């Protein structure tokens, strides 16, 4: 699926401003290294993780444990200041999940504590991106469902990182060569 696109860029010079990313290779540190560097006329992909957080043997998979959600909500209700200092203002916001849970060095918190993640949508960024949407139809949040998943693998985590960091600066297109369940039900977003 990506090889013809790579050919077009490499040999024909077509769309060298676009970045082709093979999601099955995104499981490897050497490929992530390539994605965090500019290529042709395309800037790097928005992956903010330091290499030590994705190198081989690190973040190969992270368990999804939605049973922890109620305990976290209880902590936010009973001790809001301490909870916000620990996990950010929005506990299930994608950026906070990646920062405080997925990339945690503490084994006690190195998991995903929910099966529903959120990305708060910057409506001004969407408008500036040139998307043809009426202002009143831009939702406040994008919902990412992990229902039925026991774990996310490195390629899944990198895809979530791209979504979390992109802020509508560049579009993300995904070729669906496998079932939608492999893409965290992102088909409608």
Residue ranges and their predicted role:
Residues 3-189:
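ER/secretory pathway lumenal C-terminal domains and tails of membrane proteins involved
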């Amino acid at each position: 699926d990506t090889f013809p696109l790579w050919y077009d860029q490499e040999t024909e010079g077509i769309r060298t401003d676009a970045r082709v990313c093979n999601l099955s290779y995104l499981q490897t540190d050497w490929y992530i290294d390539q994605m965090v560097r500019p290529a042709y006329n395309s800037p790097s992909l928005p992956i903010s993780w330091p290499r030590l957080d994705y190198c081989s043997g690190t973040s190969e998979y992270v368990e999804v444990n939605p049973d922890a959600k109620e305990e976290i909500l209880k902590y936010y209700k009973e001790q809001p200041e301490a909870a916000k200092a620990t996990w950010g203002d929005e506990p299930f916001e994608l950026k906070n999940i990646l920062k405080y849970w997925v990339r945690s060095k503490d084994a006690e918190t190195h998991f995903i504590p929910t099966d529903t993640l959120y990305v708060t949508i910057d409506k001004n960024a969407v408008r500036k991106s040139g998307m043809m949407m009426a202002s009143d139809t831009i939702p406040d949040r994008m919902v990412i469902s992990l229902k039925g998943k026991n774990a996310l693998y490195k390629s899944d985590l990198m895809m979530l990182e791209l979504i979390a960091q992109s802020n509508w600066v560049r579009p993300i297109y995904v070729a669906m060569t496998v079932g939608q369940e492999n893409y965290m039900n992102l088909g409608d977003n």
